[in-house]
């Protein structure tokens, strides 16, 4: 009976993945997609008290802080529109925390903030999004 319940639970999870696993899936897709375009991964899911950064990548000498968003429907403005000013502020605070924790001079390190927006399977890469 336990085996049957475990299999049913696994099938249920495959049909209806949780939001975190769906988010992780699209973060992995975004990371591979960016790597195919020449960016190098630095870290994934950087967290601090003020916020979180999904991906930190490097493109040449530039650190790229990437927010990954997925929306199955665009009825509420779509994936890119879901990166609100409040969310942008939290990402910037997390980036500043990253600089401090890694002894990086914020004034001399080139950086930018990108958004990878998924609506379906195709990513929309918005460079210098904010």
From Swiss-Prot:
Q: Tell me where on the tree of life, at the top rank, the source sits.
A: Bacteria
GO terms (molecular function) for this protein are: nucleic acid binding
Q: Which Pfam families match?
A: UPF0102 (PF02021)
CDD domains the record matches: PoNe_Nuclease
Name this polypeptide is given? UPF0102 protein AHA_3896
The record's section on HAMAP family has: UPF0102
Family that this chain belongs to: Belongs to the UPF0102 family.
User: What NCBIfam families does the entry give?
Assistant: PRK12497.1-3, YraN family protein
Q: Which InterPro entries match?
A: Restrct_endonuc-II-like (IPR011335), tRNA_endonuc-like_dom_sf (IPR011856), UPF0102_YraN-like (IPR003509)
């Amino acid at each position: 009976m336990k085996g049957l319940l475990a299999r049913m639970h696994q099938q249920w999870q495959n049909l209806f993945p949780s939001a975190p696993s769906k988010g992780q899936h699209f973060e992995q897709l975004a990371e591979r997609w960016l790597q195919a375009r020449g960016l190098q991964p630095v870290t994934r899911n950087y967290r601090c008290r003020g916020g979180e950064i999904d991906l930190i990548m490097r493109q040449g000498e530039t650190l790229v802080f990437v927010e990954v968003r997925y929306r199955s429907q665009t009825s509420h403005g779509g994936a890119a529109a879901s990166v609100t000013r409040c969310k942008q502020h939290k990402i910037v605070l997390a980036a500043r925390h990253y600089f401090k924790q890694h002894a990086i001079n914020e004034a001399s390190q080139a950086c930018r903030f990108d958004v990878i927006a998924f609506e379906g399977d195709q990513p929309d890469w918005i460079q210098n999004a904010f």
